[in-house]
Amino acid sequence: MKKNLLQLVLLTILSISANAQYNTMTIPEAYYGTVGANGVTFNLTIKDTVKQFRTGNQTVTGSISSPNVKNNFWGPTLIVNKDDVIHMNVTNNLNEATTIHWHGMHLPAIMDGGPHQVIPSGTLWQPYWTVKNQAATLWYHPHLHQSTQSHVTKGVGGFIIVKDAAEAALAIPRTYGVDDFVMALSSRRFLATTNAMATQLIDNYGDYAMVNGTLNPQVSLPKQVVRLRLLNAEIQRAYNIGFSDNRTFYVIANDDGLLETPIAVTRLPLTTGERVEILVNLTSSTVGSTLDLKAYNSTAEIQLLTPGQSTFGWPGLEGNPTTPTGNNGPINGGLLNNTTFNILHINIAAATTGAITTIPSTLISNTYWTLADVTNTRTITVGGGNGGTAFTLDGALFTTTMVPKAVNLNAVEKWTVVNNNIFGHTFHLHDVPFKIISRSGGNIGTTVRAYEQGWKDSAWLPISGSITFIAKFENYSDSTWPYMYHCHALTHEDEGMMGQFVVNSSLGINQESGTTDFSLYPNPANDKIFINLKDASTEIYYVTITTVTGRVVMMLPQPEWQNGIDISSLASGVYILQMKDKETKSTTTRKFVKK
């Protein structure tokens, strides 16, 4: 084992020395949280920072850090297990409000982190939930309406890896950072005079590709089967993934879990917000050799996927105006637009001890909902975009007060999303995964491609195309806090291409609620404050703690209040605790003193 590790280290050093024009790809910290009596706790801090991307000025960025590693772009990879109860302590130290959405996670709407769960600057948000997802590659990112693009562009986000027993039983790579790698694919534009990243809504496409926030990245991969967890973390660009030697690779999972069998491909479309797990067999590669992961996004390559039409973006492919801006690349365009470009340079290193050397023939068994299970159908239509207007869903632009669609708890619904529009889009659904059952139009035929036949939460909508999927809205209901559905091109969602829905339960609608009267003790308090309910039948829906001037310092959705609320991080002073009742949604406030 020591010999193999030494070989790997030496080959990595030699490869880096021989490829000085490349930068070593950042591998985000694997963060397992802290195990306690009530579950697993993750402490995450969002902050403004800087990163040296290019020669000259540093670039102002944003990041998410754990207590272990202080990042300057992107955040740690959260490793969780199915059935874990996880507690998130999210502190927003940006100079502005934001949110954190747990993309792909099945959880209560009040914990979802969409545009409704705003975290003001200087505030601690404490959602928690039981992990019900099967093994999958998920991610987390800001979702503040009209600020999602700018916050993601700055680098705020990270991966979530969910593990379970079914995945653990498979003979596939799973040693993080050795034969199992997360890779967030994106690109950025930099202003020529300051090196600042372009974050305006018109900055849809980057000029320089990066992986995990690393420009011109390279990585050493062992001579064996490796697992790459790919995320399209772009603002708007889609990728047509392949390798420079046109090798076959194998799709084993998409957005929300493993497939039944590996799917062999040489090209793989990946649109914004989508994730895919692939296996690459490097056993026949020569140690010291190289290859590249590429985006085959040239006009000719794209039209191989959809004859006579672009796969991504406008009918004339990605935006490619000729008007220069004085920065890098054309306005609303990018130096990479309509081209085939390198994503990642790969150096082949020695195999590790216990290496996986074959691709499995089968994976897991999934049980999907069928048309026979459907209790309701819906059609959503994409509109807008003409003459520079914002894109819409069902003719409306999003507001937090718009009337949500109402879904019944445990309903199995069939949704058809129709894109008779001038642009391609990615449709993303919060709360639950869906199963695509058909496609139509868009020059891609009606067959759902094999690599997208698993559980999805994001799906590509080509121009003049539509998708139909089935989803079951189970486990969580909340008539107050909605979930979202929207285009995952960040510029489009920021402009209002979003809708919302609530999941209603028929139970408890007429249930009588207890009084919301309560007291706090001890008062003054030092480390914890306790709530004493006058009526034990009262259910606490939300607790917010503010200063006497109204600044929010703590947000606790459906708190586990019985063992006290931890206020040890608060400065000494007078605070106001606001408690919202679950049934009536009425709010009652009490003052307390922090010693």
Q: Where are the predicted features?
A:
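C-terminal outer-membrane/trafficking sorting elements
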Residues: 16-19, 510-521, 525-595
